[in-house]
Every structure is written in C-alpha cells, then in structure tokens.
Amino acid sequence: MDTRPIGFLDSGVGGLTVVCELIRQLPHEKIVYIGDSARAPYGPRPKKQIKEYTWELVNFLLTQNVKMIVFACNTATAVAWEEVKAALDIPVLGVVLPGASAAIKSTTKGQVGVIGTPMTVASDIYRKKIQLLAPSVQVRSLACPKFVPIVESNEMCSSIAKKIVYDSLAPLVGKIDTLVLGCTHYPLLRPIIQNVMGPSVKLIDSGAECVRDISVLLNYFDINGNYHQKAVEHRFFTTANSEIFQEIASIWLKQKINVEHVTL
C-alpha cells in the first residue's frame, strides 16, 4: 500500500478531464494537480519554453511527494515526456499512446482524425504512434489553437464557441470515422464537437484512456492506495486566478473543491 498522491500536470484546466475519470475509476487514490493557466496555452510556444515550463510543474509536484506523475497535457507529452520519464525514478505517464491505441481499436474504416494544439500537431506524435501500431490507418491531423482559450475563459457554452468549433472542424467533416481529442481541454467542448462531426464519428478522449494505464502501473509497481479509504483529500493548484479555475473544476468534477494559487 502506498498512500502518497498521484501528481497531475497540465497547461491549465484541461487535465481535469483526466482527473474526473481517475476519481470515477480509482476513488481511493489521492491527487495533487497543478494547472499552469497563467501561461496557457502551451501549444503556440517554442519547444524550449514548453520544456522549461513543464520541468517547473514536475519539480513542483516532486515537492508534494507524489508516487507517480501524469502528463495530463498532450503538448507537454509531445515535447517533454520522454526526457522527464528518463530522468525520474518514479513512473511518468503521458496521454498520447493510450489515445492512439484507443483510436486504432475504434476505427472501422481506417480513417482517423486528430485535433490538438499547434505544437502537438506539428510534432506528428499521434500519426507516428498510430501508424507504428497500425500502418494501414490513415491519419488526418488538424491544429485547433482557438479551443484552449475558450475553455480557459469558461466560455464552453457560448455562441462564439459553437462558431469557432464549427469553422475549425470543417476540414474533417465527412472524412473520418474516429476523432482523437488530442488535447485534454477538448473534452470540455465535447458536446459541440460531437454535434459538428455527427453521431457516427467516435470521439476518443486521450486523457480518459490514460486512466487505464495508470491503474496498470499502480499494480505493476505495487503502489496502489488504500482501497478501504473512503474520504480522500485532493489538492488543486493553479498559477492563475483560483476563482475561475475553481468554477470550471467544480462543474467538471461535480463537486466543490478548494483551489490554491501558486507562483512557480
């Protein structure tokens, strides 16, 4: 038994979509979450800067005595995950491979779309992972840089959000049967995305898929939390306005949470 928390990092609130699924599947595990909303989005930034910011988040989580770190951010996974994983002596998990694997299982026509930040799409990481496992699958990647600001400003239900999503996804409509939400912010726009793509297109939440791998690693390294513990205390940190973060988090997690501000 290991009652230390699992650490989650993201460029903002998007990683909460992963946390929500973890709380549902593994309610006995403690969580420490850090969202760098003050510097979001990461997608348009240079690789060097993304690595620097990611290491700051990692080092913060290490001060919280975490037993595992989850990159709940596709951009950070694409740019810095391998480097961090090699440097630490605790498990470090990214969201890309679980999402890629789920897309392969889902597609029936071998036509997969991937949407993400400019950096994630430019890295071509999803196409590489998907075609490494299933060379015959065709992958269409599309950067959607306007999606993260919509979520970070809590405007997911606005009319402008609907227009931006509709306009952004137009190049993929009718051309794919599976769409990977290659940014953990994007599931917060899921109803609009599904409406634009149509009911026949399967949406893959890479963050939610990641939780299955978390469970596997907890078992493999024998670091599961206390299954009998009913009341688990989580801690949430943000580098930006804690009130906005708390509002979004409370809606998504369906529970009131306390959010602490931190300066990195």
UniProtKB/Swiss-Prot annotation:
The record's listing under Pfam families reads:
Asp_Glu_race (PF01177)
Q: Which reaction does it catalyse?
A: L-glutamate = D-glutamate
Task: Name the pathway it acts in.
Answer: Cell wall biogenesis; peptidoglycan biosynthesis
Q: What GO terms are given for molecular function?
A: glutamate racemase activity
Identify its protein family: Belongs to the aspartate/glutamate racemases family.
What this chain does, per the record? Provides the (R)-glutamate required for cell wall biosynthesis.
The protein in question is named: Glutamate racemase
